Amino acid sequence: MKKETQNLQCIPLVISVLSLFGVSSARKPPYLCNRVCGGISIPFPFGIGGKECYLNPWYEVVCNTTTSVPFLSRINRELVNIYLPDPTEYYSNGVVHIKGPVTSSGCSTGTSQPLTPQPLNVAGQGSPYFLTDKNLLMAVGCNVKAVMMDVKSQIIGCESSCDERNSSSQVVRNKICSGNKCCQTRIPEGQPQVIGVNIEIPENKNTTEGGCKVAFLTSNKYSSLNVTEPEEFHSDGYAVVELGWYFDTSDSRVLSPIGCMNVSDASQDGGYGSETICVCSYGYFSGFSYRSCYCNSMGYAGNPFLPGGCVDIDECKLEIGRKRCKDQSCVNKPGWFTCEPKKPGQIKPVFQGVLIGSALLLFAFGIFGLYKFIKKQRRSSRMRVFFRRNGGMLLKQQLARKEGNVEMSKIFSSNELEKATDNFNTNRVLGQGGQGTVYKGMLVDGRIVAVKRSKAMDEDKVEEFINEVVVLAQINHRNIVKLLGCCLETEVPVLVYEFVPNGDLCKRLRDECDDYIMTWEVRLHIAIEIAGALSYLHSAASFPIYHRDIKTTNILLDEKYQVKVSDFGTSRSVTIDQTHLTTQVAGTFGYVDPEYFQSSKFTDKSDVYSFGVVLVELITGKNPSSRVQSEENRGFAAHFVAAVKENRFLDIVDERIKDECNLDQVMAVAKLAKRCLNRKGKKRPNMREVSVELERIRSSSYKSEIHNDDDDDDDDDDEDDQAMELNIEETWDVGMTAPASMFNNGSPASDVEPLVPLRTW
């Protein structure tokens, strides 16, 4: 039965909504209108904009777009605030606060004539406004009498004076205005709604006596400290007035309640409960019948003048629900709530939330841990595959056979090198070339190393690569960069060398610095150390090793400016009984032995030729990578040889050393370089002979005794020699089968990559 009653109640609700808002398909619902102006909320039945936004013109609010100040258009007063009916806040009716007029006299121009503004007019056919009983008539100043106008059959007013005798009694009675400098009085209820305020001068008082005087209606409660200064009220120009508002029941659109219960009906039925959403009270004012509706304060809040405007309050989330239920379960219901005993085993919501959150957190950690484990397993599997593919097992076997050499190369793990290079951070890059990148790193023992990460390696060269690593790891010479080890757990092998801090010889020859000047003595010392290192590689190592890429960019200088021969990327070891090595041509333009270029047979004399070019660089200070232009269009080496033969030696000596050098020594080294550059490898000295000869040249007792037995032969073969030089230059791009990056006519790759081999094994 109750359910049927509720269904029947929905019918008048729908009808009232349609009648109240004049709903049609073409009209916008009032809850979609603008509801704020100047920070003031404008709830329905008030509204801004079109007719669908407010109930009728009496409720229209005009929002000044420039100042964002709201005005009640029908009474032309600035709006301060709007309150919906709320019995809990002592607003049985709706309330609006507006700015009312202030009447003044003698405040600005010095005249005693009162300045009386337009009276406050809230009357009119259908006006829902009236002055509430919270408004008072106040007069502030000395010798001022405030009188309300337009109040028929009554004289309402008050009079203030400046009698100091009343000040003590004023404080005792704790009244704001008791006649001393200000006065106040209540206004009658149920009076017409056009009310003005005038100022009169009391009898037996001078019109100019007392200074500024003001009178006004207000609902504000002022303290006794600030109410006796009339100038402040005059400067403000307004006083806040409270108006009550209601629905006129003669309006056809509000004949049916919006699903609300009448208070009188509720009294007859013994009151209303939580099932009642909103309540309407009825009354009369000055002959008018009105209705005032509000949401049931027992469990609802909102705007009762909108469909569905009164919404249920969830008391379980408020202090009232928590206090009343305490250890019981709070259950929210429409309009109210109940406290029910907890079920056996029921967990508190907070504790339950902690358990669920902890479980989810553990689950997330488990998933993350599983992901990391799988990722680690996959990475380990890949590293094992790379290790086998890159010849790791073969290298282990080779190292096992070399037990006597404790300083053999070490096999680094990928984790070690990632940690050493900060995961191969780009900020650690020392150089970058066509075949790989070199990073500066620091091992766990504090050693600074150069880590070369190659770009590619042929799979059919794995065994050869491992053999070369083992051989190079055995090199132990103070003027040769030490190969510390390698890592085979990456896609391509990573090589680890000792770090050499002071760059390469080529850069030092081009750009001398103040802290280390490349004098002739320094250059000769460097040449001797290079020759000693190459002599060691060719004859003193376990197996003869041919460097195959001797050039100034591969000659590094350590912190003491001692020579370190580097870049063994194209090096080859040979057995004792081998006299040459047949390989794919590799090298750098300007340094390659012409005989090797034609035959592809590399011998120890090929390194001698390249060293001869380095000697020419030390003497001339010029770079062989750029061609020396001459009338005969000779190459760098041929130009030097011709200058020595034609006694133009002083023309090619570096200007920076010409004045301070021992010319006998320079001439001797030049002749030695000429022998190293002989087009016939058999006529070149070996590196041991070159090393001994350079030591003799440096000796203070040395005089030029360089053997030049082959000069005549060279003279006989000048034309062939020149033709050979030209042939090399003309066929360079075709004949060389090594990568193009190795034959850079500009700055060699090693200029920026001193430790990176030009080609990976």
Swiss-Prot record:
Induction: Induced by INA. Up-regulated in vascular tissues after Na(+), K(+), Cu(2+), Ni(2+) or Zn(2+) exposure. Residues 701-761 are annotated as: Disordered. It comes from the Eukaryota. It comes from Arabidopsis thaliana. One of its GO terms (biological process) is cell surface receptor signaling pathway. InterPro entries: EGF_Ca-bd_CS, Kinase-like_dom_sf, Prot_kinase_dom, Ser-Thr/Tyr_kinase_cat_dom, Ser/Thr_kinase_AS, WAK, WAK-like, WAK_GUB. Keywords: ATP-binding, Disulfide bond, Glycoprotein, Kinase, Membrane, Nucleotide-binding, Phosphoprotein, Serine/threonine-protein kinase, Signal, Transferase, Transmembrane, Transmembrane helix. ATP binds at L430, G431, Q432, G433, G434, Q435, G436, T437, V438, K452. The modification Phosphothreonine is found at T583, T588. This is Wall-associated receptor kinase-like 4. It is an enzyme of class 2 (transferase). Its EC number is 2.7.11.-. CDD domains: STKc_IRAK. It holds the Pfam family PK_Tyr_Ser-Thr. The active site is at D549 (proton acceptor). GO terms for molecular function: ATP binding; calcium ion binding; polysaccharide binding; protein serine kinase activity; protein serine/threonine kinase activity. Residues 27-349 are extracellular. Disulfide bonds join C280-C293, C316-C330, C325-C339.
